Amino acid sequence: MNNMVNTLKTLPTILGIKMPRHFLMLCIVIFSACTSVAQQNIPKGAEILMQVYPDFVKGYNDGYLLMTDGTKMLYDDGRKKTFLQKLDDGDPEDMFAFKYDRHSWTPEYLQDAGRSRCEPFFKKMYGATEAQVKQKLVSVSWFGEKVLFTPVNGAADSLRAVATELAKHPELRTYLKSSGSFYWRKVRGANRQSAHSYGMTIDIGVAKSDYWLWKNPGRGETARITYANRIPHEIVLIFEKHGFIWGGRWYHYDTMHFEFRPEILAANPL
């Protein structure tokens, strides 16, 4: 912006014309204000994506995320979507449509922050096919087991940090057996990719877990349901500290589920 201001100041000399100083200053003020407004118009969600995924998102311009590989991705398609459409056909903006309430242990109706995953965005980062994801996976030690996890965006290192901290709490050990991490598949009953497909999600303690359909058989996605959870809050807080969201904070709860989604936590700070 400073270069443009200097250009405005020297423009009369370059063109060989006389321009009243007050008029020139007015032009500079207007230009500066317009530039400032343009900078402030970056959606908060886009700013967060740039902050937490710097290896893939380098900027935002004219409604598009600017990716580090030189491509761009529409941030908001402008469509008004139903709850299910945000899950099945979400854009990057839709990922921030729901509240991840870290101050309550009982989710509000239809607040499923993290269940909306823009598939082109996640496939850009983690891999567009099963083979592409698998070739990046690394082994992470998890309480006597080895689980496959992606190192992309620091996810595997974050899981290791979770394990290190949980190891200080032997009383929690019975909840920590892995029930699965990487698994390329669709979400049950839907046509959208499961978060497990990207290798940045782990299920734990299935024997002590609760799932909304287990407790509410036959209920639809927009029905009122009853909540249940047996996973200790201490486990949840440790995962969240290292960038993971918990499926137990969803209205459509899945309490075994921990998913590396630092953008959701950044958008919903404590």
Language-model regions, residue ranges each:
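Cell-envelope/glycan interface and biosynthesis
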Residues: 41-250
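Bacterial N-terminal signal peptides
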Residues: 25-33
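Boundary at the C-terminal end of the N-terminal hydrophobic targeting segment
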Residues: 36-39
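A cross-kingdom marker for long, charged
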Residues: 242-270
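Bacterial N-terminal signal peptides that target proteins for export
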Residues: 8-24
